[in-house]
Design a protein with these regions (language model features):
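A cross-kingdom marker for long, charged
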Residues: 236-296
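Bacterial N-terminal signal peptides that target proteins for export
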Residues: 1-8
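Acidic/His/Gly-enriched intrinsically disordered linker/tail segments
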Residues: 202-245
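Conserved aromatic-histidine-acidic binding/catalytic patches
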Residues: 90-98, 168-173, 220, 234, ...
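Acidic/His-rich structured neighborhood in mature extracellular/periplasmic domains
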Residues: 90-215
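C-terminal motif of bacterial Sec signal peptides marking the signal peptidase cleavage site
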Residues: 15-19
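Acidic/polar, low-complexity intrinsically disordered N-terminal segments immediately downstream
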Residues: 20-105, 113, 269-296
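Repetitive helical segments and hydrophobic/amphipathic motifs
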Residues: 11-12
Length: 296
């Protein structure tokens, strides 16, 4: 923990120093360069692994969060947010054997199901991920139990902790990869502007993130109210499920991706006979993930 906090202090000081230097000149350095690129002339094993991975898959492979030119990868960066309150500190993979096994997991269990439009720009493969949040000017452990997440899906990259994977058998890896794939697709689909996606969100656009009248405590009472508005899962707050609140767009998308990946149309029609909007949204999500290149 002391090592992590020391790293945080160093990073904070470096950011402040860089900000002060940036005020002297508005001319960006390396403005046209790609900080993810691998040097074509590099012949070390890691560079060859990363270069071959990109050649085969069209997405970059990272083993630390320092990019070319010294830029730090901000995995929590969100284009629509005014600020990012999340900080991620990584414990890196050390040997080329560990890195090769990590790359093999991505190629064997994730990428076969993700067409080019669904693939992250880069994968950051590390041993462990430590998550902190900024609150009231202080760095704190998250309240929701995500201090050591297994993975983090960001705009520029998806970070995966390999320590959770090394002890898994083939069946467990397949189940775990499904969870990862759902989160990767949720991140991409939630930012779509296609007609299919707009049709999907039109069912719930007046209710996303809205509280119901009155307090609902149980699934038995809350789920029919959610289903009546075309939702199949409620909002998740810091302390757990909130049946009195409708889901956000991202939560709705994630729930329907899960449904589309794991249920047939016949199963959905049987379960949600009384809720035609849910059946329609299922069909739209099935169409959407196929349009974007999900491979079963």
């Amino acid at each position: 923990m002391n090592k992590i906090l020391t790293t945080i202090c160093i990073l904070t000081a470096a950011i402040c120093f860089a900000a002060c230097e940036g005020e002297d000149s508005l001319q960006p350095s390396h403005a046209d360069s790609n900080p993810f690129n691998i040097d074509d002339a590099a012949t070390d094993e890691e560079s060859i692994l990363k270069r071959d991975f990109y050649s085969r898959n069209g997405c970059y492979l990272l083993f630390n969060d320092t990019l070319n030119g010294g830029e730090l990868l901000d995995i929590g960066y969100v284009m629509t947010a005014s600020q990012n309150n999340n900080l991620y500190i990584y414990e890196y993979l050390k040997t080329i054997e560990e890195k090769s096994l990590a790359a093999d997991f991505v190629e064997q269990y994730l990428l076969p199901h993700l067409g080019k439009r669904l693939r992250p720009f880069a994968f950051l493969l590390v041993k462990n991920i430590n998550h902190f949040i900024y609150e009231d000017g202080l760095l704190k452990t998250p309240y929701d139990g995500t201090e050591n997440p297994s993975f983090v899906v960001g705009v520029r990259a998806t970070a995966i902790s390999m320590s959770a994977i090394t002890e898994m058998d083939d069946s467990e890896k397949k189940d775990y990869s499904k969870v990862l794939i759902i989160d990767i697709m949720t991140n991409i689909i939630s930012h779509q502007t296609t007609d299919t996606f707009n049709q999907f969100t039109s069912y719930g656009k007046n209710y996303y993130g809205i509280w119901m009248d009155g307090w609902i405590e149980t699934e038995e009472e809350g789920m029919p109210l959610q289903n009546a508005k075309g939702f199949i899962a409620p909002h998740q707050g810091e302390w757990g499920t909130i049946w009195s609140a409708y889901p956000t767009v991202e939560e709705d998308v994630k729930a329907y991706i899960n449904l589309a990946m794991n249920s047939s149309l016949e199963e959905v029609e049987l379960k949600y006979t009384d809720y035609p909007d849910i059946i329609s949204k299922y069909k739209l999500m099935k169409k959407l993930i196929n349009e974007l290149g999900y491979i079963e």
